[in-house]
Amino acid sequence: MTRIAFWDVSGGHGTPTLVYHLAHMFADQGRRPLLLDLDPSSRLTAMCVSEERLARLWWTDNDDRTIFRYLQGMLPSSSSPPEAKIEELRPGLGLVPGNLSLAFFEELLATMWTRAEDPDAIAVLSVLHRATSLAEQTHTADIVLMNLGPGLGAINRAALLAADYVITPLAPDLTSVAGLHLLGRRLSTWRATWQARATSPPGQLRPLGYIITTPAMALSRRPHAQHWQDQIPGTFRLTFLRISEPATDPSADPWCLGLMRYHPGLRTLAREARRPMFHLRPGDGAIGAQMTAVVRCREDFDRLARTILTRAAELATS
């Protein structure tokens, strides 16, 4: 079983969309993926369920299957451990929905980080690890995809401690390259601090690689985008791996898990049809050139999903 966190510094790189499509592709490939929406904005959850269902999840007390309820019941101060419930999106694909109230944990987790020699603080900081373990056992998941919100906050830090690997979604722009410097340094600091204090979860925070979503307009027509894309491989190695190497073409970089197309037209159709882009049908409006794009999109995500699994298997034995 593999846990993978998807984390970027500033948002706007389509991380919920990426995670949503990967989960459906893993299910198409016969796996049992589990989605954890750990972003308080809950954008991934909003993609997965209807607005009516989302309202019931947030406001019906006896339907306590959001990540907020999981964490509440697992705090050391709680007297009633949560009942494991998974939102089944389709056969084999489960979701632990997000909740806006998750933001209330930010201050608690930040405070506990400063007291991490205290066993009670360790128990609080590892609450996401225990919640993930409960959810993955309930769903009998073989891969967990953790959707993190943007930024360097305490919720993301606790989520990364619960993950086996970290994938960084990027765009070919200045923000992504600058963000790599922030994420890489912070990841290294958090790893060293945690491993000096505790052994469970192990807190390896291992980078698995990065994914670049290219803009709808060709890079040849956006010279600045091409410039920043070429900076990503060297910057990733320097900041995440502490290896100083010159920049190279991302398509030749083993740490680049995929160069993904944006598909703006398909995104609109998929949002209206409430299905992945590569599941769109003519009845959803995917006709002519759009249907060709659907096939290409499916090929891209199939290749990306297999590359992620291969890379995780390689790192697990290294």
Regions found by a protein language model. Give the residues of each.
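Active-site signature of alpha/beta-hydrolase-fold catalytic machinery across serine-
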Residues: H21, M25, M47, A158
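Phosphate-binding loop that captures ATP/GTP phosphates
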Residues: S41-L95
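Short mixed-charge
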Residues: D63-A84, S188-R206, I243-A252
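Cytosolic-facing regulatory segments adjacent to core modules
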Residues: L75, S79-K85, L89, G94-M146, ...
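C-terminal lobe/tail of nucleotide-utilizing enzymes
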Residues: T199-S318
